[in-house]
Structure formats: C-alpha cells, structure tokens
C-alpha cells in the first residue's frame, strides 16, 4: 500500500564536506540502510570537499567528459548509481540533496510521477524565495529565467533514492571545457548560451547559499516534519568499503552497462 510523506519520521543529515567519491558511496549505503529499516527515511544535504563531474550510471565517460580538461582543473570524475545526465560541481556553487525513502512512498507511480512527487517540496521552497519554478519532465527543475537544477532517481531493494543538484552559481566557461556539451554545435557564443540555459539561484534570490538551504529545510520541515540526525559510524564504514571495492575503482567509472 502506498504511503504518504507524513506517514514517515524524516531525519536530516547535513554533515561536513566529503570527497565526491564518498558521496557516491554514501548514496548507496544510505539507500540500502533505509531499505533494510536500519535508518529512518532521510533527507541529506551534501557538502562538497572538491570540484567534481558526476556522470549517470548509463553514460559513456568518453562521450561526456574531457578527462584532460578535468585533470587540468583538478576536477574529480565519479559515477553515481542513478541514471540521468552529467553534473558539473564546484563547492560553494552547488546545492545538492538526496532523499532516501521507502519504496512505498512512490508505489504505483511512474518515474515521471515520482519525480514530480519528490520535487514538490523544493518547488514550494523556491516559491517562498520568490522564484516561479516547476518540474519539467523528466528530470529538470526550471524557472522563467532558465534551468535551476536536475534530478536523478533509482529504486533498489525496497527503497527509492532521489537526488537533485541545483546551481547556486556557475562557471560556464569551465563547465564547457570539461563537459562535452554538443561542442560541434557550439558557436563562439556557446559559453554565453550555455550560461543562459542555467540560471543560478544566487542571481535569482540574492541570498547567500546557506540561507537558501535554510529556507529549503524550513519548507521540508513544515510540510513533512524533519528531525536532526547524523551519519552513523557503521554507515561511514560501509561507504568507505564501497569506495575501495566499487566507486573508487577504474572499472566502475569506465563501465557502461
């Protein structure tokens, strides 16, 4: 039977910055922990310890990323367990969160319907910030001024992982160096047009990143309830093992299933 948001006791994890590869592993570890009942349903706000490109589970590394440019800029390239497109991440310029929920929350819903459900609270928060934002199928959060963020989702073992990366600010020139975004189609104005396609929250709100996050959390708490929490030692240990055995290994990054 399908459950509702308020049927669950939601917990918040907002810890210190972590390495990009550890974030990938934490997503798997926490999804599995919720699936098994070892952890309550959780909202996790990510803090990044380093710049990164995160590619989707089914993307080709060669087609998506200029690895020479990534190395030149000191950007770590990692692969996540969910589908979707490549994300360009810089600490301080990005707001990323994951929701780890029992699969019952999205039972009977299509992926499109579940994206809309899982993004509704953040659209409410953006509205409180004066931004008219909407869900644009399949996985974008958009506004009149341009794209704000992108979502990805996977379902595994009785749980659903839904995560979103939103641009607080953006270095469009660097992004275009590292990501292969239709380079053959880009004119000399490519950087300008790419920047227009993404309209960051900083320019739309005028607020510091921390205040945007605080307003987001206030909306989630008001709508669904939210209790403070932290990563447990066992969860971190499991994530570090996943880094060694999977996410930090070359085959995972290079492999396309």
PLM segments and residue spans:
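Active-site loop/lid in soluble adenylation, ligation, and acyl-transfer enzymes
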Residues: 1-68, 72, 80, 182, ...
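Catalytic beta-strand/loop module used to bind and position nucleotide/cofactor moieties
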Residues: 67, 87-222, 244-257
């Amino acid at each position: 039977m399908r459950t509702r948001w308020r049927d669950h006791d939601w917990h918040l994890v907002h810890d210190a910055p972590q390495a990009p590869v550890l974030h990938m592993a934490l997503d798997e570890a926490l999804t599995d922990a919720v699936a098994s009942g070892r952890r309550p349903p959780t909202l996790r706000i990510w803090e990044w310890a380093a710049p990164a490109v995160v590619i989707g589970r089914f993307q080709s590394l060669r087609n998506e990323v200029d690895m020479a440019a990534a190395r030149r800029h000191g950007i770590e390239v990692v692969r996540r367990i969910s589908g979707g497109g490549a994300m360009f991440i810089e600490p301080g310029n990005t707001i990323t969160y994951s929701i780890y929920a029992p699969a019952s929350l999205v039972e009977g819903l299509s992926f499109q319907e579940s994206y809309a459900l899982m993004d509704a609270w953040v659209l409410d928060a953006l509205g409180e910030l004066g931004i008219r934002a909407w869900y644009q199928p399949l996985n974008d959060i958009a506004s009149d001024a341009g794209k704000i963020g992108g979502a990805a989702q996977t379902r595994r073992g009785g749980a659903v992982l839904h995560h979103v990366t939103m641009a607080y600010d953006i270095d469009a020139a660097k992004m275009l160096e590292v990501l292969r975004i239709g380079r053959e189609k880009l004119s000399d104005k490519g950087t300008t047009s790419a920047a227009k396609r993404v309209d960051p929250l900083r320019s739309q709100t005028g607020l510091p990143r921390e205040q945007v996050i605080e307003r987001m959390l206030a909306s989630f708490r008001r709508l669904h309830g939210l209790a403070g929490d932290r990563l447990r030692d066992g969860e971190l240990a499991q994530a570090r093992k996943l880094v060694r055995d999977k996410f930090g290994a070359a085959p995972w990054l290079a492999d396309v299933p």
